[in-house]
Each structure stands twice: as C-alpha cells, then as structure tokens.
Amino acid sequence: MSKVKIYGADWCEDTQHALRHLDRLGVSYDYINIEQNEEAARWVREHNDGKERKPTIEVNGRVLSVPSDEELDAAIKG
C-alpha cells in the first residue's frame, strides 16, 4: 500500500481535486493544511524552489508538485 501525504489548502481547487481523485481510487492519505502548519509549509517551499505549490504530494518518498491525475496514478502504482 502506498504511503501518501497531501500538502495543500482547503480553498485550493487543485488540492480538492487531488483529494477527490484519491477518494475515488480508495487510496488512504494524510492531508496537511499548510496554512495551519508552518513546518509543513516550510517543507513544501523547500521542495518547490521556495514556492508554496498546492498540492504538493509525497508518495512513498517521491515528491510531486501539482501532479496530473495520470502522474499521481503512476506514482501510486509505483
């Protein structure tokens, strides 16, 4: 089973799309709202050249920034 963490914001449509996509696939994940967690926001900036790209998704240690559904599916499948 893939370990998935989604770093995003509640108001962000791309974040919400990714959450719905994973729900449809039945993939469990941890969602971290970077607007309420400065340490997580810092982690996102470190992995995105100083930008808070939402969503930034970590799948089994691999970091994806604003991935397409296909990119996310491929990362989950390994």
Regions picked out by a protein language model, each given a short descriptive name:
Residues 13, 36, 64:
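Glycine-/small-residue-rich active-site loops that bind phosphorylated ligands and cofactors
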Residues 28-41:
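Thiol-based oxidoreductase modules, predominantly thioredoxin-like and allied folds used
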Residues 48-57:
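Structural micro-motif
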Residues 59-78:
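Non-catalytic, surface beta->alpha helical segment in thiol-disulfide oxidoreductase systems
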